[in-house]
Amino acid sequence: MANVSMRDMLKAGVHFGHQTRFWNPKMKPYIFGARNKIHIINLEKTVPMFNDALSYMQHVASNKGKILFVGTKRAAAEAVKEAAINCGQYYVNHRWLGGMLTNWKTVRQSIKRLKDLETMSQDGTFEKLTKKEALVNTREMEKLEKGLGGIKNMGGLPDVLFVIDADHEHISIKEANNLGIPVVSVVDTNSNPDGVDYIVPGNDDAIRAVQLYLNTAAEAVKEARTAQVEAKDSDDFVEATE
């Protein structure tokens, strides 16, 4: 299983929280102390909590569940997309559109429009339009792809959210809570951990820390999916030889 060690976390700067004056007292159980007015996160708490979160995501993946990676801060956006694609899952990395989960019916219509436009761009329909019409359609397609490209093949609501910054992505967490969708989230010292089912206390700004969370989660999910395929293949083999 893709576990993370304390050394990995120290190297990535996971233990550096925010300035002490910006802290959220609800994060007190996960804070080791302060240094130069910066809160230091207790990695002895973070390591097992992150590994629990990874186990849960592996459980979801091994049951063919859908995991939605959420990270819309500019610094994390590309890493979020890469990690989700790497493990065959889904992502929102541009902007969380209000109602993305709670108003799925409308989102589904927008996804259908995006797929229709993609088909039109590939089957020569755009070439039959006037330049202006083709440009309008191309721009609409690009805008929809930016907002919904990471979930266009999700085919329904996700089974779990993996969020990089609980504070920045509070709307997505609230929507997941309203629908009873479990939330795994990195929670820094300035954030509110309420509404997060699997809290990962850690730095949510340092790109090395963000990449550590994302890459480890992607590897864990891939591992679980590979094991599931291998188990199915061995079941088929047993049936064939009986």
Curated annotation (Swiss-Prot):
Pfam families membership: Ribosomal_S2 (PF00318)
NCBIfam families from the UniProt entry: rpsB_bact (TIGR01011)
Cross-referenced InterPro entries: Ribosomal_uS2, Ribosomal_uS2_bac/mit/plastid, Ribosomal_uS2_CS, Ribosomal_uS2_flav_dom_sf
Organism encoding this protein: Idiomarina loihiensis (strain ATCC BAA-735 / DSM 15497 / L2-TR)
Similarity-based family: Belongs to the universal ribosomal protein uS2 family.
Signal sequence region: none
The protein, known as: Small ribosomal subunit protein uS2
GO molecular function list: structural constituent of ribosome
Domain of life: Bacteria
GO BP field: translation
Keyword annotations of the record: Ribonucleoprotein, Ribosomal protein
